[in-house]
Amino acid sequence: MAAPMELFCWSGGWGLPSVDLDSLAVLTYARFTGAPLKVHKISNPWRSPSGTLPALRTSHGEVISVPHKIITHLRKEKYNADYDLSARQGADTLAFMSLLEEKLLPVLVHTFWIDTKNYVEVTRKWYAEAMPFPLNFFLPGRMQRQYMERLELLSGEHMPEDEEELEKELYREARECLTLLSQRLGSQKFFFGDAPASLDAFVFSYLALLLQAKLPSGKLQAHLRGLHNLCAYCTHILSLYFPWDGAEVPPPRQTPAGPETEEEPYRRRNQILSVLAGLAAMVGYALLSGIVSIQRATPARAPGTRALGMAEEDEEE
């Protein structure tokens, strides 16, 4: 019997099953199609088989880490949300996907990762609280730098140098995109009628993040809340496909009293290695930046093993 497919994705918050755009899109598509996945909602990307999130481990052991490729694999496994679409609807899907990536993705990156107030009070706060020590000290900042580079690539050569002008242009195009989506959806349940398709999975992931996060600087959020059919669309998908999801940072898993399970030694090993890697990174940074210098002195006793007592919490659901 083949092993089950396993999906590794960022854990949930803000009333959503995942706070990450790509993870949310893949999760939603899987729910739409009823794909039998063993889902691991985690807050440590190092525990993913690819080192990134989301990632799919197939029944044959192959690891796929690009959202579109994950969905393509699910289609090959006969979990195809677009099976009943016409050729024209397929073309519309491609057109709207391009529109989302060109007009809405840049402003989503700006809203959560570039806007200082939102980043400090919402984005960094969530990741710092959800991630295990010591990743929470440096990984959110590294992710922010990666998203800054991503925004530059998305904006291309036409990216205004003036920050205020860039923000004005991004939000203007995003508002136009949302209005167009609202007009296209109309009074339908989904974009192509009564059944969800892959386009719905991606549109929902964009809209739900904007709607659900409590943003102190929510310019686009205010515009979206004025488009009542899009708000009802997100509420409908959440209640129908994720009725039990969307909790805040999951509590640590309770370890049952009694004999050690078969996986326990490996879990402890991974916890210790994770802590050692994090400590090594922090010490290396301190030495390179000059925060700490090494001087000759009388050798001191090495710290005992109790220093390794803090290990990451198991965020898996």
Swiss-Prot record:
InterPro entries: Glutathione-S-Trfase_C_sf, Glutathione_S-Trfase, Metaxin1/3, Metaxin_GST, Mito_Protein_Transport_Metaxin, Sam37/metaxin_N. Gene3D superfamilies: 1.20.1050.10. There is a cross-link at K38, K41, K78 (Glycyl lysine isopeptide (Lys-Gly) (interchain with G-Cter in ubiquitin)). It comes from the Eukaryota. One of its GO terms (cellular component) is SAM complex. It is found in: Mitochondrion outer membrane. The chain crosses the membrane at residues 164-184. Interacts with MTX2/metaxin-2. Associates with the mitochondrial contact site and cristae organizing system (MICOS) complex, composed of at least MICOS10/MIC10, CHCHD3/MIC19, CHCHD6/MIC25, APOOL/MIC27, IMMT/MIC60, APOO/MIC23/MIC26 and QIL1/MIC13. This complex was also known under the names MINOS or MitOS complex. The MICOS complex associates with mitochondrial outer membrane proteins SAMM50, MTX1 and MTX2 (together described as components of the mitochondrial outer membrane sorting assembly machinery (SAM) complex) and DNAJC11, mitochondrial inner membrane protein TMEM11 and with HSPA9. PANTHER family: METAXIN RELATED (PTHR12289), METAXIN-1 (PTHR12289:SF34). Involved in transport of proteins into the mitochondrion. Essential for embryonic development. This is Metaxin-1. The gene is MTX1.
